[in-house]
Amino acid sequence: MAFLPRYYPENIEYLKISKENTPLKEWYIPMTCFCDIPLHQMSYHAEGKAQTGYGKFSIALHKKFGINNGIQPVQYLNSNSIPTEELRNAISILLSDNGQIYSDEALISLSNHLFEYMRRIKPLDGSMKKWDKEGKKYVEIKKNFHDEHEWRYIPDFESDELPFLLYRQDDIIAESSSQFYTKSITETKNGLLNFSVSDIRYIFVDSILSREKLISFIKRKQKGKRIPRAEKDILISKILVYDEIKEDW
């Protein structure tokens, strides 16, 4: 079993950066995101207000799974702070570089560090794109990101495989219209985030009917990597109905 990362749009207007005199409003990062939240706060994130909730289906994993796989908490930024201003200046230098940075080994190391940091930042609050209820298009919603305690898995692509980040308009159009880059992640060497039954703590579903359907699916599963019957039983024992247990929180 594995999580498949996808190129996800991040609103970066708060950084106020430009490329070739054109303001950058968003970039796409290949990632799988997790929230490090206590169970008693889960209803706020699952249901939220209007379209801000993420839904009642989720998988809870042991934290050691994330730590062992190099999953990193994001850094939340106050857009008015001095560190954010200095970061803005550094990113502008990196984006406007004409090749000089990559002629010096020390500067290469510094630029690589900055680049990885760029992929793991988020404002304290702001807007984000989220699939609508029908799963047909993105809608933009307002969120307090700091409440999510987000951790990110970002695949370690080889330099000749896929882009580490999309910011050019033609690349963004290709991804947003057809998931051009996301569909290629399965072909990369280290793109998938593998996990096992033992890594799972709970599986939440919205209703008893959904639990019955999921149990039936697990029992019938034949395609792909086979799961031994004993592990199927363990997996089934981890399934919880959200609406049944939320009152206990």
UniProtKB/Swiss-Prot annotation:
It comes from the Bacteria. Keywords: Plasmid. Pfam families: AbiGi. Confers resistance to phages by a mechanism of abortive infection. Seems to act by interfering with phage RNA synthesis. Does not act at the level of phage DNA synthesis. This is Abortive phage resistance protein AbiGi.
